[in-house]
Amino acid sequence: DWSSDVCSSDLTSETIMISLYPTIYHTFQCKADRCENTCCQLWTIDIDEATAERYHTMTGPLGESLRQAITVDDEGSHFVFSKEQPMCPLLNENGLCKVVLELGEEGLCDTCHMHPRFYKYIEDLELCGVGLSCEASVELLAEDTQSDQVIFTIEDDDGEFSPDERLTIQNIFELLAFDIDSSYFQYSPNPDVQYYAKLLDLYGTTEPIDEEWTTQINILSHDTGKLITAVQSYIANHDMGLFNKVFQYILYRQIDMLADYSLESILSYARDGVEYILITSVIEGSPLKQVARWSQQIEYDEDNVELLLQHYDSLQ
């Protein structure tokens, strides 16, 4: 498969691990109670077995609160939030986690401790990052207005690479033995009626995160001609640097999917993603919120990612 093809002597040996990090990874910090769109809501959090055992046997008021918050089924222990109770019951009145306040971050389950960090692997290459569903991640990505490129650091076990070395997304593909023209890594908006109609139809087939997602798709599909005019005006009056970085970051997160899907499919996935973010930014405003919203709907639903990539593969 593709994974074994790219792992040449330049990349790996029996003992070497190479880790890549977007620079925002190193400065990321949870906003906690300052977050307007907390991750402590509206989804199911799987609790690892070791932490679940500790929670179930913990004494005192915190232990009681934890047991009341946990749902147990055949697949294990979970924190389950619903429309009726969207927020984690372990948040105090100030929006701070009771577990962290009493036990520190090491008291969290693996999912809560790691989120929104992600790690993907291609043989001995480790792709690290922080997910765009988190507003703190998106804000960090947007902070550097002097560049429209995502910059990465590289670390390896044997010191072959300098800690001061900086890479672009193109350099990463070169590490993987892909010789691709730099133009493929630059996002170019494509306000076109037929393209937008197909994009909205396709996104309408994804499993919605909530009713608002479906409503938004329907509204955007109502008059694509007017939508094109609005997008063209936005492009003429706004810098596209953030959208280019988002495009590269979306692409980076799915590099490991090249084991199962074509490069063209991965590029289409990233292009469509950032085009949809552009569209919603034009209509709804708040581009940073639109990035996080898209990520929650698409990136954090593996079924939706697979659905889209299978669609793009079927077109070739």
Regions found by a protein language model. Give the residues of each.
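Internal, well-ordered alpha/beta segment that forms a basic, Gly-enriched binding/recognition surface
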Residues: G95, L103-F178
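Short linear interaction motifs
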Residues: L20-Y21, E93, A259
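Extended cationic-aromatic binding surfaces that line active-site or macromolecule-binding grooves
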Residues: E75-H78, S82-K98, E102-E106, P189-P208
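General N-terminal leader/first-domain-start detector
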Residues: S9-E64
